[in-house]
């Protein structure tokens, strides 16, 4: 079974290195070979080792590009898609626009919103908490969605600047023990992820996805939105960067076949 794994920002393919072999060869780890996947882990367009678009593109366009990769370039008849952060957003759009090709999606983050907004008191209370949370969360996102090049000129000449910009998110969005980032990530893992941005000189083009989504219409599905009917699994981690909407809200958007509230973990799971 082909399995497309998609990272987000400020992540990279480094996030998946420790699980690729387990998914591709479960028999080496006490599992059954019948459960093996063909694992495809691309750098998103503009990120890392992938090509750089000539101008900003958003997650919906990236969904089309990655669907083409799977169906036309790699010649799979169908596939499964998994993602967190932007990878989850792209998985949403794959489920919406390419349901004939993608048979199921798994997400551990939800950034898209229903065009009709909250419908119950519980959902309205969640929306209020989310809006309040964004006062402190939204600074980097606003910069990258409106003036990414201004930020990039400084960062492209400063590996320390890139490291600080990225590690602040890794620290803030993770389920740390005693506020120690090394309780979750080794220095090698942190530096490997940072160096993907530094060595490939893609800090600037990686931020473009925020600009691209704004041009695509932002976090809301279009007004003519119809529920995504392919099977959808959701993994909810307690230290996610933003609280998930209530289950009732999510059920109006997806055909949820598995809903798992994890005992620990954060945005980068």
Locate the predicted segments by residue.
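The serine-hydrolase catalytic nucleophile loop
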Residues: 9-21
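C-terminal subdomain of alpha/beta-hydrolase-fold enzymes, centered on the catalytic histidine
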Residues: 144-269
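Alpha/beta-hydrolase active-site loop signature
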Residues: 10, 45-48, 112, 266-267
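Short beta-strand element of the alpha/beta-hydrolase
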Residues: 1-8
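The feature captures the conserved acid-bearing segment of alpha/beta-hydrolase catalytic domains
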Residues: 121-148, 223-227
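Conserved hydrolase catalytic core segment
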Residues: 20-36, 69, 73-129, 137
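Glycine-rich "HGGG/HGxG" loop immediately N-terminal to the catalytic nucleophile
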Residues: 14, 29-31, 40, 44-57, ...
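Alpha/beta-hydrolase active-site loop
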Residues: 53-73
